[in-house]
């Protein structure tokens, strides 16, 4: 039996219900009144397994990426405390990044003979202290920072940020297309060799630019702009990402590795201003379900029956344990995983989150959720009320106290939030109108 290969595709700030296979209420937003914005991902879901209760490790970018790299709660590393790592404070900082000595999914698979590549966004610290090639990837093409212009490839401070390996490079073109092309080329080269490809798109993260919006790129002064974009622009960005995913999947078919490759798609956190999270409430930066419940699609013809939907609760870091389990590779004994393999149908779960932003705390235990925001506490039955509108704290006081106590027990096992941890929230009430 061949060892499986792995492709992990990560979107950036994608909402829970944006894809056709997750509701697709905005079908037609890209200009075709009859179409989903995600035909290739919809097909992937029909050929594999779709999760209804998949979660990101955080409601914001880089913390989730720490968990995806290590298989452990991001709170265990100093860099995971910033929400998120920001270029202006992290460049040259030897504390804010993924330590090269820490084992990662990429390093463990590389040491087991896999070809490894990260095509896309890194956002786990800056050279010279950190980088993909220092953490298990043999190839890297993409930006180091959290967000870049799709045409100029400059970060939020105006610094050019596109790398091939450890060398800064200049390329012409729409970033989503550049990443898709490079990923398809990587897959095509791996005939007969097991590989691990991390394809981490920046789409549909701001700036709000489709393939046709190079003039908009020249107009905006700040890529975190609040004076542009639209629902149509946003869903076109998703559609163009989906087209690239289709090219990568076609390359996989052409190599004959389709049946032996586990392909997973997800998002780093919940959606931003133009996204759809129905029926959930909340968005990026919130520990409400809309900020942390994300699409999970997994296709592995050799391992999963096609066309299934599961309500199994899962979290980003579980995919590290899952990939290692599928590959027959043991985790590093000095760095035990917090995630668990989803190949073994784990059943009811205990999942935990915390954020410095608004002093948020959350625990999902079975079907119940404990939530605290700036000291206000809530209890929700997620099966009956995934929208989190019925606070059952006083109707079920024993359940509430049990979940709060369990959260406190878990938090006591984690490092405290550092006093100097930064929160970089790019939109304020003065620039983006907020609902009450």
Segments and roles (model prediction):
Residues 1-377, 382-405, 409-412, 417-436:
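Formylglycine-dependent sulfatase
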């Amino acid at each position: 039996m061949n060892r499986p290969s792995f492709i992990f595709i990560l979107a950036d700030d994608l909402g829970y219900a944006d894809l056709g296979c997750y509701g697709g209420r905005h079908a037609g937003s890209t200009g075709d009144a009859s179409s989903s914005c995600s035909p290739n991902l919809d097909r992937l879901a029909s050929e594999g397994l779709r999760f209804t209760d998949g979660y990101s490790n955080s409601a914001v970018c880089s913390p989730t990426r720490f968990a995806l790299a290590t298989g452990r709660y991001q709170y265990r590393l100093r860099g995971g405390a910033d929400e998120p790592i920001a270029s202006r404070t992290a460049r040259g900082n030897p504390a804010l990044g993924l330590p090269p000595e820490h084992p990662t999914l990429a390093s463990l698979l590389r040491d087991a003979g896999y070809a490894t590549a990260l095509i896309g966004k890194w956002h786990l610290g800056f050279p010279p202290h950190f980088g993909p090639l220092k953490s298990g990837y043999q190839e890297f093409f993409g930006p180091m920072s959290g967000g870049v212009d799709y045409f100029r490839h400059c970060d939020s401070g105006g610094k050019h940020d596109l790398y091939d390996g450890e060398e800064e490079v200049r390329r012409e073109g729409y970033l989503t297309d550049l990443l898709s092309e490079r990923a398809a080329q990587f897959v095509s080269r791996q005939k007969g060799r097991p590989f691990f490809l991390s394809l981490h798109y920046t789409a549909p993260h701001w700036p709000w630019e489709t393939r046709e919006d190079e003039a908009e790129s020249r107009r905006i002064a700040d890529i975190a702009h609040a004076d542009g974009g639209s629902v149509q622009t946003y869903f076109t960005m998703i559609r163009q990402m989906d087209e690239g995913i289709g090219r990568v999947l076609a390359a996989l078919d052409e190599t004959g590795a389709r049946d032996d490759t586990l392909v997973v798609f997800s998002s780093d956190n919940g959606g931003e201003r133009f996204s759809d999270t129905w029926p959930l409430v909340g968005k990026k930066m919130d520990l409400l379900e809309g900020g942390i419940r994300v699409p999970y699609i997994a296709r592995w013809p050799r391992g999963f029956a096609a066309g299934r939907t599961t309500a199994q609760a899962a979290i980003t870091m579980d995919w590290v344990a899952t990939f290692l389990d599928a590959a027959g590779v043991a985790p590093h004994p000095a760095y035990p995983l917090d995630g668990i393999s989803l190949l073994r149908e784990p059943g009811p779960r205990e999942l935990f989150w915390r954020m410095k932003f608004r002093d948020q705390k959350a625990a999902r235990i079975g079907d119940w959720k404990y939530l605290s925001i700036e000291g206000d506490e809530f209890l929700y039955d997620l099966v009956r009320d995934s929208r989190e509108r019925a606070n059952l704290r006083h109707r079920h006081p024993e359940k509430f106290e049990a979940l709060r106590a369990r959260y406190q027990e878990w938090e006591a096992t984690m490092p405290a939030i550092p006093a100097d941890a930064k929160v970089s929230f790019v939109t304020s009430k003065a620039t983006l109108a907020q609902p009450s």
